[in-house]
């Protein structure tokens, strides 16, 4: 997935905000997932470890590590976008992500939910840095990662 349209200014905004958020990535990852489920409660059914869970989200033993991994991967991918010229998630991981999302029944519109949740999480995490330009930078980075995952959303071989 080409890093077209991701400018030096956007890269600087993403890097600056990610450097600030990195130290709280576990907490922010959990916030990110809680926002996804607030926006789209039905999305809970897409996660095998949440589907039939009766414990509160914060107490689900599998949610924290998953949420942190997803948040970190999303942010790290955004930071590398301009330098690499494309989404840098390893191809094998991208294929696995695509297949997993496909198998779970994730639809294209679900990525709009993750974008809203990501933007809200970042806005709350670094309010003093937040600006329309930063919002645009993170939107662009999210959209390129989402497109890369969607392009691999097919049955696994």
Swiss-Prot record:
Keywords: Cytoplasm, Heme, Iron, Metal-binding, Nucleus, Oxidoreductase, Oxygen transport, Transport. A motif (Homodimerization) lies at residues 38-42, 108-120. Residues 5-154 form the Globin domain. Its EC number is 1.7.2.-. It is an enzyme of class 1 (oxidoreductase). Gene3D superfamilies: Globins (1.10.490.10). It catalyses: Fe(III)-heme b-[protein] + nitric oxide + H2O = Fe(II)-heme b-[protein] + nitrite + 2 H(+). Predominantly expressed in leaves, to a lower extent in roots, and barely in stems, flowers and seeds. The record marks 135 as: Homodimerization. Heme b binds at residues 48, 62, 66, 96, 100-101. Induction: Moderately induced by waterlogging in roots, but down-regulated in leaves. InterPro entries: Globin (IPR000971), Globin-like_sf (IPR009050), Globin/Proto (IPR012292), Leghaemoglobin-like (IPR001032), Leghaemoglobin_Fe_BS (IPR019824). The keyword Transmembrane helix does not apply. Phytoglobin that reduces nitrite to nitric oxide (NO) under anoxic conditions (e.g. during flooding or in waterlogged soil) and upon root nodulation. Required for general plant development and during nodulation, especially for the onset of symbiosis. Monitors nitric oxide (NO) levels during early phase of the nitrogen-fixing symbiosis and buffers oxygen in functioning nodules. May not function as an oxygen storage or transport protein. Has an unusually high affinity for O(2) through a hexacoordinate heme iron because of a very low dissociation constant. Involved in water stress tolerance. Homodimer. This is Anaerobic nitrite reductase Hb1. The gene is HB1.
């Amino acid at each position: 997935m080409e890093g077209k349209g991701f400018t030096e200014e956007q890269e600087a905004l993403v890097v600056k905000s990610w450097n600030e958020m990195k130290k709280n990535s576990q907490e922010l990852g959990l916030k990110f997932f809680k926002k996804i489920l607030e926006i789209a409660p039905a999305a809970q059914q897409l996660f095998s470890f949440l589907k039939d869970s009766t414990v509160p989200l914060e107490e689900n033993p599998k949610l924290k590590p998953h949420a942190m991994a997803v948040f970190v991967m999303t942010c790290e991918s955004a930071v590398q976008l301009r330098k690499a010229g494309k989404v840098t998630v390893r191809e094998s991981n991208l294929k696995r992500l695509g297949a997993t999302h496909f198998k779970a029944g994730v639809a294209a519109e679900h990525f709009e939910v993750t974008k809203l949740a990501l933007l809200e999480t970042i806005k709350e995490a670094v309010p003093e840095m937040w600006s329309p330009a930063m919002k645009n930078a993170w939107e662009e980075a999210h959209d390129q990662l989402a497109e890369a995952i969607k392009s691999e959303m097919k049955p696994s071989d």
